[in-house]
Structure formats: structure tokens, C-alpha cells
Amino acid sequence: MQKRLPRSLVEKIMQKIPLTVRGAEMLKQELQHLKSVERPAIIEAIAEARTHGDLSENAEYEAAKEKQGFIEGRISELENKLSVAHIIDPTEIHAEGKIVFGCTVVLEDLENETQVRYQIVGDDEADIKDNKISISSPISRALIGKEEGDVAEVQAPGGVREYEVIEVLYI
């Protein structure tokens, strides 16, 4: 019999954005860079553009203001994400061999008998070149809750793909 989480806890977690420790650190570094480097540089660029006269026909000024809007929007977005982040350390997961957010899985594609290794991460961390797949991807959704030896069926553009779970790691 599977243990079920209380509904209130599930709802609370669902309001949070799951991030690995590394993913949260990357967002914090980007936020720090935007605030300490990019924001001051664009403020300086706007001040410089103002010295060039009529603002209504000043392309430099318009470009700098547009960039400022982008930077301020990204700062706001990062601050919001970090404020609602649920940071998960894969090394502290006790999922008894089940595939959960943050874990690394070794899979065998049953069609061509090749093995792949993925870490299941948040949307902002996903990078297929680095073998990090989003928790919201079709393959992750098919894998969550599976254990070693289980077979997951994934709806792919070319049809259904089957993957056998070879290993589940919490690293």
C-alpha cells in the first residue's frame, strides 16, 4: 500500500516552483549579476544618452530604456520565482527507489537498446545538452513514481517510446 501525502501538503507544494539546489543557485547568481552589473550599466547608458539632446528622436535613449525594461522585468521574475521556490536537495531525498523530482535516472530505450541518463529538474534548469529534463516534460511525467525495472511509456512525436528504468540515483 502506497503512502499518500495529505492533500493540504500536496496543494502547498504545488503552489511552489520546484528547484534543485544548483538551479536555485544559478537563479540567485543571475539576479545578483543583473542587480550589481547590468542595472547600474543601463542607468549609466540612459544618463549618457540623455546628454545627446532631444529624447524624442534619440535612438540610443530608446534602446537603453527598452533594455532597462527587460532587465527590470527579469529581476522581478527572478525575485518572484525565488520567493516561491521549493528548493530540493537530491542527496536528501528518501524516496525508497522511486523516481522523484531532483533524482537522476538511467534508462534503456527498449526500441534501440541504448542507455540514457537524465536528471529531473525544474523548468528553468532544463538543458537537454546537459541531460537535465524538465519536470513538466512528457518523459518526466511518465517516469515519476516508477522504480528500477519498471517500464515507462512516453508519448513522443514519432509515437510511443518505451524506456526501462535501469537505475535511480539521488546525487
What does each model-identified segment do?
Residues 1-72, 76:
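Helix-rich terminal scaffold detector
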Residues 28-30, 65-68, 81, 115, ...:
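Generic alpha-helical hydrophobic packing signal
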Residues 33-36, 70, 80, 141-148:
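Short, intrinsically disordered, mixed-charge
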Residues 50-52, 84-87:
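Elongated periplasmic alpha-helical coiled-coil
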Residues 72-86:
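Amphipathic alpha-helical coiled-coil segments
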Residues 88-169:
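Non-DNA-binding regulatory cores of transcription-related proteins
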